[in-house]
Amino acid sequence: MKQIKLILVALGILAVSSVNAQTKAAPWPEMKAFHALMAGTFHPAEEGDLKPLKEKAAELQKAAETWQASKIPADFKEKETKETLDLLVKQTVEITAKVKANVSDKELTGLITSAHDTFHKIAGECRKTDGHEGHGH
């Protein structure tokens, strides 16, 4: 009888754990996709390598636009997140235009740095919690 009770308690704990895991904030796939492109363009630019940014500027812009069009998760401040995503899209549009205009690497580095800072505002300050997700670089 003790073993049955122990098994039932263990099953109950597993069920509660499973429900808790499911109620945690789901990842925002569009943010993760943008972050992957941002990391692949910003970090080389920090080191003076603008080639990845020049090659992927349009892709970065498209990812920002896709992210902007996606549903904002409940664990983000909706108004602040929307406004900051709008800014991020404007920044990536400008980056794409400046790449096409063949501006200096110094100017492009400044633009991608600003866009990177905007990304981190969304990832950190726009959250309803104190967490800062997705900055494993």
Task: Enumerate the predicted regions with their spans.
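Charged, amphipathic alpha-helical oligomerization/scaffolding segments
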Residues: A33, L37-G40, P52-E55, E59-K62, ...
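Short, solvent-exposed, charged loop/turn and helix-capping segments
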Residues: A64-K82, A101
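Short, structured helix-loop boundary elements
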Residues: W28-M31, L50, A57, E78, ...
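Immediate post-signal-peptide N-terminus of mature secreted/exported proteins
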Residues: Q22-A58, K128-G134
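Second-shell loop/turn segments in exported
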Residues: F42-L50, K71, K98-D105
